[in-house]
Amino acid sequence: TTAGEAGQPRSGTSRNTVLVVGGYGSVGGLICQTLAARDDLDLVVAGRNPSKAAAFARSVGGRGVRLDLDDQSTWEPACRGVDWVLMCMDQTDLSFVSFLFAQGIHYADITASDGFLRAVEGLAPRRSMALISVGLAPGLTNIMAAWGAARLDRVERIDIGLLFGLGDRHGEAAIGWLADRIFDSARDGRVVDMAFGFGAGRRTLYAVDFSDQHSLARTLPTDAAWTGVAFESRLATAALFGMGRAFAGSRLMRDVSATVMKRLRFGSPLCSASVAVSGWSKGERVATSVHFSGAVEARVTAQLAALQFEQVLSGPLVAGVHHTHQ
């Protein structure tokens, strides 16, 4: 949604002050390292532990502050003089985002939880810009899907595939997020075979509730959108999603699987995405696909998030909530 132009940096200059919540976490820390290389912004590292925030901030040339999402008394001091807040933690409600919009502070978020992003869309800020669907998935996958959809007269469906290596070191929050969705009793049971580029071949993908499929269905003229996940090991993929189906809703098995995923370390740190868009063009049925391949999911997510965020900083600020592909 668009609600007119947003304000300039609060300093009155072209220099922005960017506060990264969760800035010393696995993805947030990598984003901070990338943004710290820019000479046109001031970086603030924020988190619940002020000592960790200060120590990490010193290592990247920024400053650290305490910000606890559960303690509203920390919000105003931490956000004083801030132009942008880049959120690298999942939230349970809109209190903090509403606070930012009331202050005219701009907002970006790397979460992959559609329920929260839909709630942010509903706030429709008039003085702030919000950038959501940031990173790899959502983020790059949205852009890939939009690119494919733009080449068709009518889009019938969008299939998004994510392929992860088991040699990667994923953050605890990311593993917990994925385990929650694999063992979700309401998880879509559909399975799709999809081709990945760069020699990865065809893979069997299992549905996972990433937000990209939902935001694309809301913002692009498509009949359907779907996101699935596979791991580099076909055996591990079948075993994990088989457990998710057999023990759907079991907190115990969810926790056991999360522990196994955290400790399991074999294969490569592969991180790939494939997007297939099918539909009609000039009266003929056509399909197009786009592939991406990288290594180390946290690093890829951070680099893409920083790049997408930097693109917004370099352009005009438009109030309202915008997905990356918009």
Please give the residue ranges for each predicted region.
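N-terminal Rossmann NAD(P)H-binding glycine-rich loop of SDR-like oxidoreductase domains
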Residues: 19-36
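Active-site-lining helix/loop region of Rossmann-like oxidoreductase modules
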Residues: 21, 150-278, 283-287, 299
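N-terminal Rossmann-fold cofactor-binding loop
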Residues: 46-50, 68-69
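Conserved Rossmann-fold cofactor-binding substructure of NAD(P)-dependent oxidoreductases
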Residues: 68-82
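N-terminal Rossmann-like NAD(P) cofactor-binding module of classical short-chain dehydrogenase/reductase
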Residues: 83-89, 107-109
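ADP-ribose/adenylate-binding Rossmann-like module
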Residues: 99-117
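Rossmann-fold NAD(P)-binding glycine/threonine-rich loop
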Residues: 111-130
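C-terminal helical cap and adjacent loop that interface with cofactors, partners, or active-site loops
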Residues: 266-326
